[in-house]
From Swiss-Prot:
The active site is at C120 (proton donor). UDP-N-acetyl-alpha-D-glucosamine binds at R96, R125, P126, I127, D128, Q129, D308, I330. Belongs to the EPSP synthase family. MurA subfamily. This is UDP-N-acetylglucosamine 1-carboxyvinyltransferase 1. GO terms for biological process: cell division; cell wall organization; peptidoglycan biosynthetic process; regulation of cell shape; UDP-N-acetylgalactosamine biosynthetic process. It is found in: Cytoplasm.
Length: 421
């Protein structure tokens, strides 16, 4: 029988102290599949978070023939014995980022067979732009009974203009193009920090990628990739979550091991609401002493406000003064936290891609469910500020992206514990 945990939170404490941010989940789950493209040498990747998505990928690449070992915050991958292009385990179906195996295996073997992935249920998350890119490089793509088959005699560099800005497609096609013949030019690409991180990792293995983080990425194909040592960037989303939690609870917290530039859109909103945010090297201090005012938020591709922080921000807006409007422009079904927040007394209603919020003075503790990763983070923040006790169920979603969340908040003064059901 599977062991299930829940989080039990007694709200009302202010937060004080320091919190260290781990390596970026969104970077790690793309870099680990990228590592299997190395036909020589060993990849040592550090600043890796102890989260379920990383553990899941470790099991997947082992099933493909890689030798994998882990230390406290590093993963060592020897993919020289990679012997399968067929990724069809239960773990593949469990997580969205397993689709990066398609681009990686296509680059390495010129073929891939991958179960269509899962992850958080936040609406239709099509891979049509991935397929467009693979086909443009010369691959034939078929989907049958939940399995995607991709195969090419040769991958030939070309110009690809994505119809929509897609983080996943940008990375996946970049992976395949790295080992293609000739030059590939990707336009209308996503610019998120973890895309730059993946490109830097590939370049460390011997790739020739220029322009990641700009409007156009140029990839000159190489014949092989070689293992390297690399450190993953800090997690922008984890950092933003702790910043928002501090603003919600009040107090003063230094968020360490961050790249402040990656947090500018979050910092700007918190300052607009009345919180204080100070940058200092690789840390950000958040201070909040009084009531915050509601603001309007629209999620946008980087450098805009991150969709992954929309749900935690919604919890903060629920206890801010006045009205707020949250427009989710990236995903069409990312408001599953709304019903759970309503159980806690929030005045929040969702219609289409927009949530309308009227701030209330207090939230009340309740029993709620984490329907997805970032909704779970939103409920933790709501529980931290609510009167009474909040129990959060289905926290396996939270464990996919937030390492030791209860320990980190406890060190900041929160009354939070993990309980086995």
């Amino acid at each position: 029988m599977r062991v299930m945990d829940k989080l039990v939170i007694k709200g009302g404490n202010t937060l004080h102290g320091k919190v260290d941010i781990n390596g970026a989940k969104n970077a790690a789950v793309a870099i680990i599949p990228s590592a299997i493209m190395a036909s020589e040498g060993i990849c040592t990747i550090d600043n890796i978070s102890d989260i379920e998505d990383v553990n899941c990928l470790e099991r997947i690449i082992k099933s493909l023939g890689c030798d994998v070992s882990c230390s406290s915050d590093a993963i060592i991958i020897d993919s020289t014995k990679l012997n399968s292009y067929n990724a069809n385990t239960e773990d593949v179906r469990k997580m969205r980022a397993s689709y990066y195996l398609i681009g990686a295996l296509l680059g390495r073997f010129k073929k891939a067979r991958v179960e269509l992935p899962g992850g958080c249920p936040i609406g239709a998350r099509p891979i049509d732009q991935h397929i467009k890119g693979f086909e443009a490089l010369g691959a034939e793509v078929t989907i049958d009974h939940g399995v995607i088959y991709v195969e090419a005699d040769r991958l030939i560099g070309t110009n690809i203009f994505f119809d929509v800005v897609s983080v996943g497609a940008t990375i996946n096609v970049m992976l395949a193009a790295t080992l293609a013949e000739g030059t590939t030019v990707l336009e209308n690409v996503a610019k998120e920090p973890h895309i730059v991180d993946v490109a830097n990792f590939l370049n460390s293995m011997g790739a020739d990628i220029k322009g990641a983080g700009t409007d156009i990425i140029r990839i000159s194909g190489v014949k092989k990739l070689t293992g390297c040592s690399y450190s993953v960037i800090p997690d922008q989303i984890e950092a933003g979550t702790y910043m928002i939690a501090t603003a919600a609870c009040g107090g003063e917290v230094i968020v360490n091991n961050v790249i402040p530039k990656h947090l500018e859109s979050i910092s700007a909103k918190l300052i607009e609401m009345g919180a204080e945010v100070e940058e200092n090297g690789d840390s950000v201090l958040v201070r909040c002493k009084g009531n915050l005012k509601g603001v309007n938020v629209k999620t946008l591709p980087y450098p805009g406000f991150p969709t992954d922080v929309q749900q935690p921000m919604s919890s903060l807006l629920c206890i801010s003064q006045g009205d707020s409007i949250v427009n989710e422009s990236i995903w069409e079904n990312r408001f599953k936290h709304v019903d759970e927040l309503s159980k806690m007394g929030a005045n929040i209603k969702a219609k289409g891609r927009t949530a309308y919020i009227k701030g209330v003075e207090k939230l009340q503790g309740s029993v709620v469910k984490a329907t997805d990763l970032r909704a779970g983070a939103a409920l933790v923040i709501a529980g931290l500020v609510a009167e009474g006790v909040t129990e959060i169920l289905d926290i396996e979603h939270i464990d996919r992206g937030y390492p030791h969340i209860e320990d980190k908040f406890k060190k900041l003064g929160a009354d939070i514990k993990r309980v086995t059901i």
